[in-house]
Amino acid sequence: MSIKIELFGITFENPLILASGVVDMTPELLRRAHKEGAGGVVTKSIGIEPRKGYDNPTVVEVPCGLINAMGLPNPGWKAFLEEFEKESFDFPVIVSIFGGNPEEFAFLAEKLERVGDAFELNLSCPHAKGYGLEIGQDPENVYRVVKAVKDVTDKPVIAKLTPNTSDITKLGLAAEKAEADGVSAINTLKAIAIDIYAKRPILSNKFGGYSGPGIKPIALRAVYDLASKLDIPIIGIGGITTWQDAVEFLLAGASAVQIGTAVYLKGFSVFREIAEGIRKYLEEEGFSSVKEIIGLAQKV
């Protein structure tokens, strides 16, 4: 049975997408993710200027996941474009971009128009001052950023939403009003880990983003809420490590899912395992496509 999906007019071999920020953004590693079963990939977030990121330690493993504060390390748009515009991929590549204001997002979308199949707007990084979270918590800012990007590109635009808010649906509705093609949710939760013997925060940045199985129920609720209010597709993110997790997100209303921390902890093979589990589930439950189960839990 095929578990292909159509999203934003793009064909994905399956509904599993490599999340941004998990692996280095070399073309070779993105191809490896696809070879191991990812239906598509999202690059690391690209900004206007190169960023070194934070000093180590930048990642700490905690019960039920990870806390990371990488600091949005990236080579800048010029170096990224130089490396990627000469590459061709036989699978969907979504380019993640970040900026400090709508003009910066629009600038990057214009400059990177020749690369990838869609843009994901990182409106929700919880640990990089002046970017992401500080922009993405305000529905008006979400609207302005999405609209600025939509004004300069014909490619699909996906707004990545923060869970660090009282009502994520307001952010989703703002993105939809600005004609976003879809939203992805959730990004990481702002968190901290403390070394009880050193008596100080473990990460060099003190705070980071919490990801992994521990945030799955929160992410699932966010997707469920968004699906009840929005008419545009939702990509579910947050703690997906098994095929059962992925199916839950699809039933909640996600059209596809992104997988990140599970790749860090278990390797790329997690994509094939989850894809096979989804395929068997559909067969056993009498469905002929992924599309048939999207949002079924909304109809109770």
Curated annotation (Swiss-Prot):
Substrate binds at K44, N68, A69, M70, G71, L72, N122, N187, T188. GO terms for molecular function: dihydroorotate dehydrogenase (NAD+) activity. Disulfide bonds: none annotated. Keywords: Cytoplasm, Flavoprotein, FMN, NAD, Oxidoreductase, Pyrimidine biosynthesis. FMN binds at S20, K44, S45, N122, K160, I186, G212, G238, G239, G260, T261. PROSITE patterns: DHODEHASE_1, DHODEHASE_2. The keyword Flavoprotein applies. SUPFAM superfamilies: FMN-linked oxidoreductases. Binds 1 FMN per subunit. Its EC number is 1.3.1.14. Signal peptide: none annotated. The keyword Oxidoreductase applies. It is found in: Cytoplasm. The active site is at C125 (nucleophile). Its main location: cytoplasm. Transmembrane segments: none annotated. Belongs to the dihydroorotate dehydrogenase family. Type 1 subfamily. Heterotetramer of 2 PyrK and 2 PyrD type B subunits. HAMAP family: DHO_dh_type1. Catalyzes the conversion of dihydroorotate to orotate with NAD(+) as electron acceptor. This is Dihydroorotate dehydrogenase B (NAD(+)), catalytic subunit. The gene is pyrD.
